[in-house]
């Protein structure tokens, strides 16, 4: 929705200007048109498209496709510092009307529409069931009360750069930005540090959340900016939300149609069924000292 797009990029621009050192140059500044973020919207009978314009952001070093333990430890510490800094300035940011629940409400509207019944034929009931499971867990863990901070969700070694001593230097690509719990960043961070490393051909399996390499990342993150038990238990629900929102609902906007269809088929055959058994919260909690 264009209104959410405009809202998000206004927040990003304020965030870019308000982040203190060492993150004061981490994000690009938007071009401005008067007092507004410079966007352009094109609409006709078939298309409703929009873009936003940013100043260039400098790049430092890219991480290797497969990280070693030094990189993982440093990234755990760096992302903890970044999230903590974002939390400290979150009160200075414009309000956001988009939440996890409003996105799922929108998905339900689509599923209940004539278009949605055709687009998601045979899987409408499964989508409703997954939304119900998410909302039950959200209520049990009181996840709506988690602090809301700026999160970019999609992290991969192609959209941020680091210094030689693995300090976060710059980030570009803000397509999935939102104000939400810091936990929304963790599925993609688990992929960044995974044993498989960064890949050009991929699936969205839950496996990276259970790897020892991600546990190493969490330990170093937790030592700087401690996680709560409820946040750890919410990790598989963040994964569930990601599949519902970015694969099922918006997949055809972010991926080529053929690849979007592949990911959606995998969602029903593999991703959703793996949620209950693919992540051991107790193992993580014990490792973090709970």
Predicted regions and their residues:
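ATP-binding pocket architecture of kinase catalytic cores
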Residues: 1-90
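A glycine-centered beta->alpha junction motif in the catalytic cores
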Residues: 47-65, 109-117, 244-259
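Short small-residue beta-strand/loop micro-motif enriched in glycine and branched aliphatics
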Residues: 60-64, 170-171, 198-200
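A cross-family kinase active-site recognition segment
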Residues: 64-123, 148
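All-alpha amphipathic helical-bundle segments outside canonical DNA-binding/catalytic cores
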Residues: 70, 229-239
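Active-site acidic catalytic loop and adjacent metal/ATP-binding pocket
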Residues: 136-184
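Active-site activation/catalytic loop segments of kinase-like enzymes and analogous catalytic loops
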Residues: 184-225, 240-258
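ATP/Mg2+ or Mg2+-diphosphate-binding catalytic cores
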Residues: 245-290
């Amino acid at each position: 929705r264009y209104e959410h797009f405009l809202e998000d990029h206004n927040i990003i621009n304020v965030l870019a200007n308000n982040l203190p050192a060492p993150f004061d140059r981490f994000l690009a500044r938007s071009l401005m048109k008067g007092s507004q973020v410079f966007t352009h919207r094109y609409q006709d009978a078939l298309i409703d498209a929009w873009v936003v314009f940013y100043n260039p952001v400098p790049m430092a070093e890219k991480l290797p496709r497969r990280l070693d333990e030094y990189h993982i430890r440093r990234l755990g510490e760096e992302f903890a510092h970044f999230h903590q800094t974002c939390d400290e300035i979150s009160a200075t940011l414009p309000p956001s009307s988009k939440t996890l629940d409003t996105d799922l409400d929108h998905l339900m509207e689509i599923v209940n529409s004539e278009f949605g019944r055709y687009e998601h034929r045979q899987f409408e009931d499964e989508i409703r069931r997954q939304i119900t499971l998410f909302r039950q867990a959200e209520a049990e863990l009181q996840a709506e009360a988690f602090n809301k901070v700026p999160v970019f969700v999609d992290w991969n070694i192609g959209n941020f750069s680091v210094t030689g001593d693995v300090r976060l230097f710059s980030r570009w690509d803000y397509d999935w930005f939102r104000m939400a719990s810091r936990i929304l960043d963790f599925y993609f961070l688990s992929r960044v540090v995974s044993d498989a490393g960064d890949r050009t051909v991929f699936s969205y399996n839950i496996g990276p959340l259970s790897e020892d390499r991600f546990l190493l990342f969490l330990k170093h993150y937790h030592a700087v900016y401690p996680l709560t038990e409820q946040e750890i238990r919410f990790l598989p629900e963040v994964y569930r939300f990601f599949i519902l929102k970015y694969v099922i609902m918006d997949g055809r906007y972010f991926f080529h149609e053929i690849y979007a269809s592949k990911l959606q088929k995998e969602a029903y055959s593999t991703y959703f069924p793996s949620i209950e058994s693919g992540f051991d919260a107790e193992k993580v909690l014990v490792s973090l000292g709970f």
